[in-house]
UniProtKB/Swiss-Prot annotation:
Protein's job: Catalyzes the hydrolysis of inorganic pyrophosphate (PPi) forming two phosphate ions.
Catalytic reaction list: diphosphate + H2O = 2 phosphate + H(+)
Protein name: Inorganic pyrophosphatase
Assigned EC number: 3.6.1.1
Biological processes per GO annotation: phosphate-containing compound metabolic process
HAMAP family, alphabetized: Inorganic_PPase
An MF annotation (GO) of this entry: inorganic diphosphate phosphatase activity
Gene name of the record: ppa
Cofactor(s) demanded: Mg(2+)
Positions contributing to Mg(2+) 1 binding: 64, 69, 101
Residues involved in Mg(2+) 2 binding: 69
Entry's family note: Belongs to the PPase family.
Subunit structure: Homohexamer.
Length: 172
């Protein structure tokens, strides 16, 4: 896979997310930026699993030196390496041992799964879903030496767009 050829899409309603880790996985995969191969990074040290499909937006550069992270919230796992068009609904603001590490929040766009059309912002999600996401990121590194996470709060689509636009500028 040539990541440089994957377009960012139309902000905020048709963002192309590259999935690295399927919903429900306890294995952390990363796509090797040079070869495009899906590499096993590690098995989660904690007895937990990813609460959403986890990936990134190609051709962006977040403050942590990686492409900007994104969670695609839906009810089914998406294969690692797949690209899914999605719509931004918010962002989870957090920090880890490497610095700020925000996670954009998105849902599949209407063509992919129209069941999410009524989700306009993260506050439209069930509180239980938000609690699971927050709990996951508060605890997923707890058993890993020299790693830590500080989860702050969820913010709206406007904050997500600002983070994405900054990451696009950082990449150029």
């Amino acid at each position: 896979m040539n990541l440089s050829k994957i377009k960012i899409g139309d902000i905020p309603n048709k963002i192309n997310a590259v999935i690295e880790i399927p919903y429900g996985s306890n294995i952390k995969y990363e796509i090797d930026k040079d070869s495009g191969a899906i590499m096993v990074d590690r098995v989660m040290a904690s007895a937990i699993f990813y609460p959403a499909n986890y990936g990134f937006i190609a051709n962006t550069l977040a403050d942590d030196g990686d492409p900007v992270d994104i969670l695609v919230l839906n009810e089914y796992p998406i294969q690692a390496g797949a690209v899914i068009p999605c719509r931004l609904i918010g962002v989870l603001i957090m920090e880890d041992e490497s610095g700020m590490d925000e996670k954009l929040l998105a849902v599949p766009n209407s063509k992919i799964d129209a069941r999410y059309d009524n989700i306009k912002t993260y506050t439209d999600l069930p509180q239980a879903t938000l609690n699971k996401i927050k709990n996951f990121f508060e605890t997923y590194k707890i058993l890993e030496p020299n790693k830590w996470v500080k989860v702050q709060d969820f913010k709206d689509e406007k904050a997500a767009i600002e983070i994405l636009e900054k990451a696009i500028k950082n990449y150029k």
